[in-house]
């Protein structure tokens, strides 16, 4: 079902980083009512730029680390709901690429995403009288086929795809729909230099960037198109400037 972003309230976790910032720029062009950015480090210049692109959109920043206990996330969301009354879309975009930091990679890329999603269900779940909502989780093409030199990062992205696919199937119960956007190799600071697991490939970043990549802006444009297409359960691949819905192969079914 097509979705218009005009006059909507969007909460964007990590909306100031590489792909995140370019996506935020595309979002404000869609005449949102509110764009609420939750990020670890404030960037006043970026916030000012977003406001200048479309002064009609209210852009608000809250400091947020996705690794905090879920109770703190719920408290922050309560503040945001009190101010906006409604939130239409949650974008979970926090991510790091450094397989030296095993625990933090899992905490940021997966656990934090799960916790933020779980927290907003307190407000959205129709079983609690909530209105439902839309969750857009940022995965990666490494969730389809791993970059084997960074198995921890790739594993977290595979987990995001599976978690989000489960959320989509739960939509009739919760009223909350969900899908993933999965960028291919995109020219951002994230991939300029990073560590492989156990240093199995010291030149992993250089070797990766020797292959075709896409600019962050092209990825961001397709990111927003995916939001507007609003297909519950979609697994979007955003690679080399294209947007494609992946048809996942089923090799097993629980039968329940």
Swiss-Prot record:
Keyword NAD: yes
Keywords for the protein's UniProt record, in alphabetical order: NAD, Oxidoreductase
Principal EC category: oxidoreductase
Catalytic activity line of the entry: a primary alcohol + NAD(+) = an aldehyde + NADH + H(+); a secondary alcohol + NAD(+) = a ketone + NADH + H(+)
GO molecular function, one term: alcohol dehydrogenase (NAD+) activity
GO terms under cellular component: cytosol
Superkingdom of this protein's organism: Eukaryota
Ligand binding (NAD(+)): 12-35
GO BP term (any one): alcohol metabolic process
Active site: 153
Binding positions (substrate): 140
Pfam families per the UniProt record, alphabetical: adh_short
Subunit structure: Homodimer.
UniProt family annotation: Belongs to the short-chain dehydrogenases/reductases (SDR) family.
Official protein name in the record: Alcohol dehydrogenase
């Amino acid at each position: 079902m097509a979705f218009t972003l005009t006059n909507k309230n969007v909460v964007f976790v990590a909306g100031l980083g590489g792909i995140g910032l370019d996506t935020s720029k595309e979002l404000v062009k869609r005449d949102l009512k509110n764009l609420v950015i939750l990020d670890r480090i404030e960037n006043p210049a970026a916030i000012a730029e977003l406001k200048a692109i479309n002064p009609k959109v209210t852009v608000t920043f809250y400091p947020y680390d996705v690794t905090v206990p879920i109770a703190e996330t719920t408290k922050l969301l309560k503040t945001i709901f009190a101010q906006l009354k409604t939130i239409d879309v949650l974008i979970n975009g926090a991510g790091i690429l450094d397989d030296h930091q095993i625990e933090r990679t899992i905490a940021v890329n997966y656990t934090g995403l799960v916790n933020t999603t779980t927290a907003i269900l307190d407000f959205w779940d129709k079983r609690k009288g909530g209105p439902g909502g839309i969750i857009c989780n940022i995965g990666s093409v490494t969730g389809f086929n791993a970059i084997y030199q960074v198995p921890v990062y790739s594993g977290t992205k595979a987990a995001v795809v599976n978690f989000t696919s489960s959320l989509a199937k739960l939509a009739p119960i919760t009223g909350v729909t969900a899908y993933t956007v999965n960028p291919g190799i995109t020219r951002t600071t994230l991939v300029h230099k990073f560590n492989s697991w156990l240093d199995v490939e010291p030149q992993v970043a250089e070797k990766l960037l020797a292959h075709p990549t896409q600019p962050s802006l092209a990825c961001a444009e397709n990111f927003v198109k995916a939001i507007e297409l609003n297909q519950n359960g979609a697994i979007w691949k955003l690679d080399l400037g294209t947007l494609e819905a992946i048809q996942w192969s089923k090799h097993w079914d629980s039968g329940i």
